[in-house]
């Protein structure tokens, strides 16, 4: 991204961001809908009907949406004082790094140990979002394919772990493409070929299915990583179940049988031979929507899958190590200070990850000044304070309610928050806060310290 974007572009982008915050405060969020390389990625636009304008009954939008005020002032002394209070707060417990900057000019207002690498928890997903949007492209979709060789039908995974169990749902991210939809498309060819067996091809991803650094209870927060799953292999209790690709294959075999394809026997794994012919395919929601889903819900599985796909696109093995190398390489290409950065996974679950507040804030500034670039969609995925996602129950009843779009991060010993906020004067700020080294059992207190700091910023 070129340095020093034009002032008009910045004002335009700031207005979009501020309006997005105002709209969120009014009670609804406008969602972008887009589509999108050969193989498991496709650049062909997907066909779907226009969706109705979103609305909710619990709140209404204000009659006039305020635009960003380019002449608004910020009390820099108040920001500096608030940061000092955060650093001295007994609630913070751990080691604090933070950066606050003016979104329009990019100038830093206050900072504390900005370049110290710290455990980012789920703020790692901000990096994953930026890298996935740049490397894969916001309009790219993930392709699940049915291929036939002899009497075998191969279900080839392309990275979509959010397949629906039935037909397609163009209004959803989870379930945009469906196993039933694929069976509808493949059934005729399967019957003509005399298919009797379903084989699952999960060869797109290599290496371990679980990151060895993610242990204990944290391992239960992410799916066994395969490039194919129905609803991320969650059961009715929302827990992840084993062998998600095999489960998807079993569901597909059942759908084929219901359409007169006499499949039988156990579904197994195997790589489709080169001569296998494609019978049908379905496509996921575009990467920009997957990024939104990941950020809004802090979805670890989507984060790891996007990282593995970045590795494939970058010529690295589709493993946790390959994803880490590809992610770091792309970061360095953007010119940010990546000193001390460690990318051990793409979700933030690994305690080995290290990012700096300055790096995260640099990404925020690039998003803020972006006019039509790949990163522009990141803000729509950030939760809104006191409204939705992982911020729905935070900062309620405060000056920051509905004024913050940010990504949360929580581990037992680390807490983080990075994003954008609108001050009481109408000025837009970028910020990043990382706290690590938090004693066991104290992360809730550390999150409260972060929230108190952000509320102070909103009043500056």
Show where each model-derived region lies.
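A small/polar active-site loop signature that marks catalytic segments
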Residues: 224, 231-376
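Beta-lactamase-like hydrolase cores
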Residues: 49-117, 183-194
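Mid-domain, small-residue-enriched loop/turn segments at the edges of structured enzyme/sensor domains
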Residues: 95, 154-180, 187-226, 233, ...
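N-terminal export and membrane-targeting signals
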Residues: 1-24, 242
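Active-site SXXK
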Residues: 106, 120-138, 228, 251-256, ...
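C-terminal region of N-terminal signal peptides and the immediate post-cleavage residues
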Residues: 26-65, 141
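Short active-site loop at a secondary-structure junction
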Residues: 94, 111-127, 131, 135-139, ...
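Small-residue-rich helix-loop
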Residues: 111, 312-460
């Amino acid at each position: 991204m070129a340095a020093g974007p034009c002032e008009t572009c910045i004002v335009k982008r700031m207005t979009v961001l501020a309006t997005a915050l105002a709209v969120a405060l009014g009670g609804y969020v406008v969602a972008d809908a887009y589509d999108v390389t050969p193989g498991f990625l496709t650049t062909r636009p997907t066909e779907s009907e226009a969706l109705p304008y979103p609305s909710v009954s619990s709140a209404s939008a204000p009659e006039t949406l305020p635009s960003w005020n380019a002449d608004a002032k910020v009390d820099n002394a108040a920001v500096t004082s608030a940061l000092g209070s955060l650093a001295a707060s007994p609630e913070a417990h751990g080691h604090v790094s933070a950066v606050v900057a003016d979104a329009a000019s990019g100038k830093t207002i206050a900072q504390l140990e900005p370049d110290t690498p710290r455990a980012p928890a789920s703020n790692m997903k901000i990096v994953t979002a930026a890298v996935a949007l740049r490397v894969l492209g916001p309009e790219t979709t993930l392709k699940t394919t049915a291929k036939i060789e002899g009497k075998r039908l191969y279900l080839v995974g392309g990275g979509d772990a959010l397949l629906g169990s039935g037909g397609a749902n163009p209004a959803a991210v989870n379930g945009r493409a469906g196993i039933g939809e694929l069976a509808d498309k493949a059934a005729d060819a399967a019957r003509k070929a005399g298919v009797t067996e379903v084989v699952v091809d999960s060869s797109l991803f290599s290496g371990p299915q679980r990151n060895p650094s993610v242990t204990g209870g944290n391992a239960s927060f992410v799916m066994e990583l395969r490039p194919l799953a129905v609803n991320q292999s969650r059961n009715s209790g929302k827990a992840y179940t084993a062998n998600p690709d095999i489960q998807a294959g079993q569901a597909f075999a059942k759908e084929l049988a219901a359409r007169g394809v006499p499949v039988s026997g156990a579904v197994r794994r195997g790589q489709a031979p080169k001569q296998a012919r494609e019978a049908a395919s379905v496509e996921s929601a575009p990467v920009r929507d997957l990024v939104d889903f990941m950020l809004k819900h802090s979805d670890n599985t989507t984060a790891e899958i996007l990282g593995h796909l970045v590795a494939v696109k970058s010529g690295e093995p589709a493993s946790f190590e390959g994803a880490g190398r590809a992610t770091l390489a792309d970061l360095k290409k953007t010119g940010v200070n990546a000193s001390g950065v460690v990318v051990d996974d793409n979700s933030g679950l690994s305690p080995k990850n290290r990012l700096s507040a300055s790096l995260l804030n640099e990404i925020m500034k690039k998003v803020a000044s972006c006019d039509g670039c790949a990163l522009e969609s990141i803000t729509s995925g950030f939760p809104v304070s006191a409204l939705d996602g992982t911020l729905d129950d935070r900062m309620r009843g405060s000056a920051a309610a509905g004024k913050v779009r940010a990504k949360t991060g929580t581990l037992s010993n680390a807490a983080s928050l990075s994003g954008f906020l609108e001050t009481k004067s109408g000025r837009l700020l970028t910020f990043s806060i990382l706290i690590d080294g938090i004693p066991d059992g104290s992360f809730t207190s550390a999150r409260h310290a972060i929230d108190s700091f952000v509320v102070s910023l909103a009043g500056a």
